[in-house]
Amino acid sequence: MSRAILQVMIRGRVQGVGYRAWVEYQATASGLEGWVRNRRDGSVEALFAGAPNHVADMVALCRHGPPSSRVDSVTSETAGADELNLRRAGEKFSVLPTV
């Protein structure tokens, strides 16, 4: 089975609205690995790894976000497996500190 790894940037009103917790829930429910974190510029960054169709579906979900968010843009690019090393030990999906 092939595996996709995408790094995603989400911009808009995506901090202070439960966006990271929502991403963690959706990604875990989809069986994805990776992480999500706030960035100091007000965006949210995420890494999703898993079956290509599940990763694509997650990126599509990110375009909508939770009800209290407003997503202005979502961009993604292929990432290397080494990016998964940012996760906390023993976790498949982590909410990381702000960078």
Swiss-Prot record:
Residues 5-97 form the Acylphosphatase-like domain. The active site is at R20, N38. It catalyses: an acyl phosphate + H2O = a carboxylate + phosphate + H(+). Signal peptide: none annotated. It is an enzyme of class 3 (hydrolase). GO terms for molecular function: acylphosphatase activity. Keywords: Hydrolase. InterPro entries: Acylphosphatase, Acylphosphatase-like_dom, Acylphosphatase-like_dom_sf, Acylphosphatase_CS. It holds the Pfam family Acylphosphatase. The keyword Repeat does not apply. Its EC number is 3.6.1.7. SUPFAM superfamilies: Acylphosphatase/BLUF domain-like (SSF54975). Belongs to the acylphosphatase family. This is Acylphosphatase. It comes from Bradyrhizobium diazoefficiens (strain JCM 10833 / BCRC 13528 / IAM 13628 / NBRC 14792 / USDA 110).
